[in-house]
């Protein structure tokens, strides 16, 4: 047998003693981790002859052992052709034949004659992929038996020479080999000695015969070995001659890093099947031959060797526009402009694209060039030029991304600037909204200090969420939707807080954060105000969730943010995406089904509340608390809180924004009494299970353990809303807006209708029609143009708290009295206060939700007449009033709806 080892087998196996088996043939089988690092250090393939001699000695021993000592060890010298002393027709049980039949590769018997590195590499790769190679002896035996047939397994799997336990001694040991614990592999006739990673690791005799550069361009050739298979000597020397030239050196250096194939091509072939050495060599040659500039070759040699040394060899060259990316020109163009960081910051990619003569049709050329430069050239730039640091690069990339995001806000900002700001909204909404940036979300903690920043952050959050969802309609619609979503989030937060007896906190980048802090505070309030243990427990659950979600925000900031958002919401004259809003209302009942789509949920809920009288009653109860909040306009400070807390408004906003589903999710848990309400279920809770009545609410809360937050809204949140709401007028505006938001409340109206029962059914129908008319979009549009003013906050003739409110919507002025829902006696007395919303207000006053459950039923009955009365009003101002009341029309059309949505305008007068 002739076994020739090329002397230039340097890095492929530096250490003959430190060899680890690798379960995957694709890896460097013949060297351990240490040798891998060492091999990476070698730049060229021509060195370490002393190691070679050691390898040669081991290989000689191996070949003697395998072939019975008949092997002749040829002096190491480069050779292009390796004589193969074996029959071209291999015995049927020969590993190559077996491999051919196993892998479906024909003509493997003639492989020894082929001096084609491509075939050799591919074959190696495939065998490697089959994981035929260095393995534990038992595993190797089993795998070999499975792959090549048990008849081919050597009687003993052992190497004929003592090798380190991890060393590989491949060889056909069919001729009884002397003992040894090396895992000699049946499939490989080439004994791969520990240092000699080449060839046989590739799975039985596949590695051997190769032409020059066969197993590796780097020529980390593998020692050949002869195994007597069926009496036929199959000696094949792994190709050791490396392709001449710098390319060969680079490849050899790369190949050294994985000694199993000793070639970069084999490296890449391991990663990408079909990526042959020849193709890779062609690529590199193209790169060198783009022009004859000597500096190009110098640079490329330096670059390849540098990347090899740092352990990240360039295995595949990037391709752009169907040709190899000219790394030399790219590097020069970037360096001439101050380095990668400057190019990114100054946006000079178009110049570089032109300099590289890339077609302008490439859409993401700048991004691709940046990523390829970062991968292949930036480490080299840092080493040679030191123009920037990786930290500066990351900062530049992040800054670029932020700018890209800002551009998407440009339209929104323009819309915001164009939006007429209502007097209320202007003070509450500082110009900071325009300064909103994506960073607001990230740095919400820092931004929390300023209300404007908070509002901006909320807007950014809404925008990003909306961006995640399919875009609906035009940008103006999107903006509206964003505002709606923000409002929904804020409302939810307020509701949660009020439930917990906390003042609503709308400020803060994330309503959820506010909710958490609010909920935490609310938990305290709950403990203090424990009206209903169940509701408190529910609050606690919500609070915990909220706590986990966000940091606490100052109440004042939160309130300011609420007002600002509300104003923004109002100011959006462009109707929110009608598609968005209306679907939300329609899907009100589906909240449980599609928590992410508030719009869908809202719509479903609106539809469903009617079928679910009890749930609707509960919803009414929940909704009334918001109404109370609205009604708590009676208590000007609490009015905004009430308004925000209004479940209808929240639901509408949430549906529109698809936003509050996180915060809603907590509340929904509470309200998941009969329906899996979506996260947006704050408002939805009211619609689904909590709106039956505030009183019912306490029961549902007990039942659901989730309505608690709504019930609390009715009791505590209403009270807290009254107590905490600092800006009555603003709040009123907000509450009115919320009523408009009442598209959600319209759903609630539907719910209320079922509550009211048969006599309300017609009203319900009307409300249904009105609610149908009032899309969240319509509601929002109405809200955006509505002026809300509390003319008087006092008590009525019967001593009940009431608000005299003036509304101007679409040029029509409405004035009316909002009556707080008082305990049963009061609510009964107050037939005109059919609004459940008012009931929540009364409940706030009472903090007697438990008592109110029965009251709620009575109130509902009262409401029905009132609703009927309101129906007339609604008929008069169905479009506008419904929006105003969040169910004013609902109040008339759906008394329950009114109760749910807002306190009824007792005397709705169209001026």
Curated annotation (Swiss-Prot):
Keywords: Activator, Developmental protein, DNA-binding, Nucleus, Phosphoprotein, Transcription, Transcription regulation
Domain ARID per the UniProt entry, residue ranges: 293-385
Organ and tissue specificity: Present in the pharyngeal muscles, hindgut epithelium, amnioserosa, ring gland, midgut-hindgut junction, posterior region of each brain lobe, longitudinal glial cells of the CNS and the salivary gland duct of germ-band retracted embryos.
Positions with biased composition (Gly residues): 202-231
Any single Gene Ontology cellular-component annotation: nucleus
The protein's name: Protein dead ringer
Gene Ontology terms: biological process: anterior/posterior pattern specification; axon guidance; dendrite morphogenesis; embryonic pattern specification; gliogenesis; male courtship behavior; muscle organ development; negative regulation of transcription by RNA polymerase II
Originating gene: retn
Membrane-spanning parts: none
Alphabetical list of InterPro entries matching this protein: ARI3A/B/C, ARID_dom, ARID_dom_sf, REKLES_domain
Traits of the deletion mutant: Flies show axon guidance abnormalities in mushroom bodies and pathfinding errors by photoreceptor and subesophageal neurons. Female flies with retn defects are strikingly resistant to male courtship and show male-like courtship of females and males, especially as they age.
Biased composition annotated in UniProt, kind: Basic and acidic residues: 19-34, 601-621, 854-870
Comp. bias intervals (Acidic residues): 841-853
UniProt-annotated stretches for the region Disordered: 1-44, 67-87, 172-274, 501-633, 662-775, 826-877
Function: Transcription factor which is a downstream target of gcm and repo. Directly or indirectly activates the transcription of locos and pros, which are essential for the development of some glial cells. Plays an essential role in defining the cell shape and migration characteristics of longitudinal glia that enable them to establish a normal axon scaffold.
Low complexity bias spans: 174-201, 252-273, 512-550
Domain REKLES intervals: 731-825
Subcellular location: Nucleus
Single Gene Ontology MF annotation: transcription cis-regulatory region binding
Residue ranges that the Swiss-Prot or TrEMBL entry lists as coiled coil: none
Cleaved signal peptide residues: none
DNA-binding found in the keyword field: yes
Biased composition (Basic residues): 737-751
Residues modified to Phosphoserine: 30, 44, 592, 594, 720
Modified residues (Phosphothreonine): 35
Ranges of Polar residues composition bias in the record: 570-600
